[in-house]
Amino acid sequence: MNSYVATLFILGVIILLTAWLPLALRRLPLSLPICCIAIGVVLSWSPFTPLPQSNPLENVVLAERLTEFVVIVALMGAGLKIDRPPGWRSWTITWRLLGIAMPLSIALIALLGWSVLGLGVASALLLGAALAPTDPVLAADVQVGPPQTGEEDDIRFALTSEAGLNDGLSFPFVMAAIAIASQAGPGAGWLSHWLAVDVFWKLTAGVAMGWLSGQVLGYLTFKVPKAGRIARTGDGLAALGFTCLSYSATELIHGYGFVAVFVAALTLRNVERHSSYHGELHDFGEQIERLLMMLLLVCFGSTLAEGSLLSLVDWRVASVAALTLIVVRPLAGWVSLIGSGHQSAEKLIVSIFGIRGLGSIYYLAYASGQAPFERVDVIWATVFLIILISVVVHGVAVTPVMRWIDNERGVDAMRPINRNAGERGGERVSR
């Protein structure tokens, strides 16, 4: 069979499933990522290779660029759909998760990597930094709904805002791991540069450029003379341009682009909070995100089925994976929410649903290309196993748990979605 034609056929099926599967799965204890990985496994058994078995150990640059792009698209979407204006008090639950849960998770996972896997300081820190952030791509089912739909309870808000910011805020820890690995030891020579550049400058630049990008793009979209406003086009394609501009502008001045994209999206919302155009931007971005996610997870499933990474899984790797998902994240999340005033059930759900995903692959690929890490194959195997378990366990649990949350709020999860500007046809479905 002609491999090119076969590839087009498979891509056509995947694109069609991108639109149809969320509708088909809306009442089932399954998620779109589970189906994508299963499709990748099935395709790996085919006599031709319609999609690559993208072993990241063999091509870290490809893994880095693909995951980087889908993450920034997801970050823009996450920022656009948060209705709650940023603030110290209104975002208290977010600051707790970022300031307590994430550093605690990094420390505990690094400790597991050092004590159980026998990793050195740099590799253990990299493992913790890569796995601590929750994922904005695979966590769509536990996030808030589209802009101005009223689907923003505290649980969904916490998981959305946390995923939007912690991908960028974990970058300093990745850079610390790179610095230690580059000097072949945990000495203090790197510390001053790390604090001044990787922590202070890059975080400051990320926030500042994100705010500036959001203000400029918001002005062009909503505030220029009416005939020239981007919002008048009604074209959601602009979301992709906003994403690329805010990310690249920040990276050019050596800031953290992940932080900038999310901040830019929040700022854009604040420029004209109730415009229906935010819905158009969000919907287009979500479609692109879903398509890219499906393609990457199909490749992920194909790589798993190929077996070279899973062959490295032993009881140590399995133990670290289980402890990370069952103990580390729930414990860190719960500790961070002590005294927050939330009910125990809410704290439990927020603590458990810290989904790991494509952001972890990005960080590992990026770091692997910057410095030589010992036993990097074991790190990759551990991360892949944790992503697989997280996708399956959280994917099975998310539908009944989110339905319970909506029932507690007195909301029908399957109702049509309404925006302030009018009705959006169709049903709310699991993404």
Where are these regions (language model features)?
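Transmembrane helical cores of multi-pass secondary ion antiporters/exchangers
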Residues: 1-431
